[in-house]
């Protein structure tokens, strides 16, 4: 766990993601036609992006689904009430030097909290977390999915648009000459 926590601290965090379902309204912006959440919450699903972190998570994971394993990495996230997109259970782990708070709440009144231990949850039930105090809070959420990440879908749409525009430009040039 110590290595994993150290890697989470050293990680380059990007305050930009597509998880608008858990972001506060003031953290959501429109970038072109896409809603973007200005929160530290990033998907890690390919080992080659961050191999050392990926391997450290895998080494302590309570369950692993090979190519269907997905990881959400969060830093100081105060998630709004939401449901997760995956079907089935997820696992969550909290790390960091925060001193208190940050519990995960469910509509049925259940509340879980505690550092450095995995909790099995059903993300299909509405849930949110409390603010934490004193320091930085990291969370790792493991879940199973065979869906392509939203970023892949967006990148494919961008590529199709660029290709369409190129075809249209070439057509206009052909017609002019």
What annotation goes with each model-predicted range?
Residues 1-118, 124-177:
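Fe(II)/2-oxoglutarate oxygenase catalytic core
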């Amino acid at each position: 766990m110590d290595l994993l926590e150290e890697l989470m601290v050293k990680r380059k965090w990007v305050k930009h993601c597509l998880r608008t379902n858990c972001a506060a309204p003031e953290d959501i912006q429109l970038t072109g036609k896409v809603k973007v959440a200005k929160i530290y919450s990033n998907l890690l699903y390919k080992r080659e992006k961050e191999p050392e972190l990926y391997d450290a998570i895998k080494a302590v994971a309570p369950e692993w689904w090979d190519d269907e394993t997905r990881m959400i990495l969060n830093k100081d996230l105060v998630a709004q009430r939401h449901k997760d997109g995956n079907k089935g259970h997820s696992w969550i782990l909290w790390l960091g030097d925060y001193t208190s708070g940050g519990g995960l709440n469910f509509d049925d009144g259940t509340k879980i909290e505690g550092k450095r231990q995995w909790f099995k949850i059903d993300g299909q039930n509405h849930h949110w977390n409390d603010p934490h105090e004193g320091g930085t809070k990291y969370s790792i959420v493991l879940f199973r999915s065979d869906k392509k990440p939203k970023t892949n879908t967006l990148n494919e749409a961008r590529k199709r648009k660029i290709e369409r525009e190129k075809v249209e430009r070439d057509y206009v040039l052909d017609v002019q000459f």
